[in-house]
Amino acid sequence: MSFSIRPDRRFPICCPVIYHVGLREGHGIVWNLSANGWRLSGDVPLRIGQTCPLTVNVPGQHPLFVAGVTLRWVRGQEYGVETVVVEKQTHSRLEHWITRLAQKSVECTP
């Protein structure tokens, strides 16, 4: 396994997620996110290289639909996915959410 540095900062979250693999619907939790990726766990197995859509239930907002993520790594039922297809409006919502998370993390720093 090669080592690589992530290009974007990841922020811890805990949000329900639904994803679709073929005819199967998976349910899980998103544990962290960045501008380009997500770490999630789920009940339907995924394989490296698979592409699937995600619907993330963001607290206090409408669900965030990401049309396509590609699976980059697997550890048991934990998955690292890269965002590859997202609508412009959804991308703007995601950027706004990340900006808010970044501001909160600065406020919490002693």
Where are the model-predicted features located?
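Structured alpha-helical
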Residues: M1-P110
